[in-house]
């Protein structure tokens, strides 16, 4: 994990096109031809490339996923996806095994990452999964990339990370909020609302997504009359609720994390729950949190794949999670994306013949299909056989097509639209 201290970071440029109403794709143009990685050189971000490794590879992988904090409900499905991928890869016998060290990202209030990231780096990991929260990822990304370690998030959606100077070491399997904001803004307008308010988490995820919703909704002829913000760790939201309600909105968008559990009771005592809109940071099962019917009819969006289309994978992920002594998964959000992140890292290591972060980073775009000429494959074992046979793999997994561009962003994405039923459980209605 050698780092060149005075190296120039990647210069990034935001390039987004082709947003559509339910499923959103960003096409980065013609894919470039594959290039050979020369051992002994450096990456464009200034990390030293190690030599190819002989024999079977062992990848040391860590995670900084939300086991605590305001996104803790995403911790179980993400860890479940990671463990299943590790087990599948280790059982495949394709020339690589993974040593997995899980960790807690926490949030920007409890700052669990301040102890976990040093622990993982000291353990010698070459890649870290996480965080789920974009704002949390931004708190430790510099520490990770300074060591030429890959940071790979299954759930970060902030557009700020597209242009972040990450030395070419940051990747994600969730699409940018440019896509979710477009879909959500169009959905609200399609539902007939003309004047909306928002309550917004004051971080890169919250304010960024709020802006993209605003852009989409106003382009459709709507008006955003208020968008009060709050900070992570706040516990009283009376002022934000009052500001959101003051202009008599038709609908209210809640761009929050777990704080929504505190916001909802006070808000729906003054505003119909059916006219609320949720986002990926808070779209989850509230059957044991609120009275039946409290959220019936409310809608929300999140990047993901329809569970009905990956039923076998969902069952395997849940069964594997339960077999490890955990309770059955209540939500599945970002589990498939985490699984695919682990598989892509393993495939990149095989292609690079190295488990060093710098070397893997140079092959992740290729194994995702972002470099022209690959053979499509859908499991780790299938793709590994292609690579081990001298071919070029193009992996698509349970989260769907990935296809990294040169910035480490996926160029395809699907946005689900869900609606709460009478039990306050979100059910997919489109996407």
Placement of each model-derived feature along the sequence:
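Extracytosolic ligand-binding ectodomains
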Residues: 2-23, 27-431
